[in-house]
Amino acid sequence: GGGNIGFNLAKNLENTIDDVRIKIIEKDKDRAELIANELNNTIVINGNGLDEDILEEANLPEVETVIALTNDDEDNLMSSVMVEKFSQNKRTMALINKPNYSLLQSSLKIDDLIDPRMDTVSTILKHVHKGTIETAYTILNGEYEVIEADIIETSEPINKDLKNAN
């Protein structure tokens, strides 16, 4: 999808990775034209990502990773399932807003589910825990935080067992 998330991801990839080849499938014709004019190295296809002809036009066998980023969870899940059906061994990622859909991930053979709420929480945690925090994640619907941090020599946990490090 060529919504805000898809557009910004494509723009970011264009700006950070040399020779990246990106294709966006966007249903809305006006939006497809708008983002096609804004992106330099991205092919924008106007159509429905659930349409087999559109997937053929996107040349799915040559694609390495498919990221479904529409505003519709069901479309994102179905797109990922169709990609697996037509072009096995591709990495699939789907944006979901309904946490219960994460239960379908393995049965639908989707590699990664993107939950914007959890990603937002992780981003906020990184800023709250400034300094040596490398990554921060929430798990089990936000019940726990997993934080990867660099420990400096003056830190309290140095040379202590993890269970005694507070």
Feature locations, PLM:
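Cytosolic regulatory regions of ion transport systems
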Residues: 1-166
